[in-house]
Amino acid sequence: MSEVQQTKIKISEKAEGIVERDIKNNVIGRRELYIKVFHIGSGTISRKDMIKAIASSYGAQEDLVVIKKIHTLYGAGISYVRANIYNDKKTLQEFEPQYLIGRDTGQKVKKGGKGAQKQG
């Protein structure tokens, strides 16, 4: 039997994560991570803290890490995080939606509204 090695990620004083799946997708040029985060006694971890922890653990630039989803179990202090680490900025721009990129960097993405032009 082969033993699966799980990587631990220190996120903050009150939160620690275990990488359950680490998939290297060479076709797209990214690394896909599935992380189980334990934050018992504290709130859900922030995207910014997750990005910093992943980038430092994997030696990646913070602007190449995208948090796809954080799902927190009610009352359990456990979250499941889905993240991608891209090889370059161009690939990230091609595959990730702009709202996710803006969400992770803290930038506001301008949406259509009253002032938006209508297609005719």
From Swiss-Prot:
It comes from the Archaea. SUPFAM superfamilies: Ribosomal proteins S24e, L23 and L15e. The keyword ATP-binding does not apply. InterPro entries: eRP_eS24_sf, Ribosomal_eS24, Ribosomal_eS24_CS, Ribosomal_uL23/eL15/eS24_sf. GO terms for cellular component: ribonucleoprotein complex; ribosome. Gene3D superfamilies: 3.30.70.3370. This is Small ribosomal subunit protein eS24. It comes from Sulfurisphaera tokodaii (strain DSM 16993 / JCM 10545 / NBRC 100140 / 7). The lineage of its organism: Archaea, Thermoproteota, Thermoprotei, Sulfolobales, Sulfolobaceae.
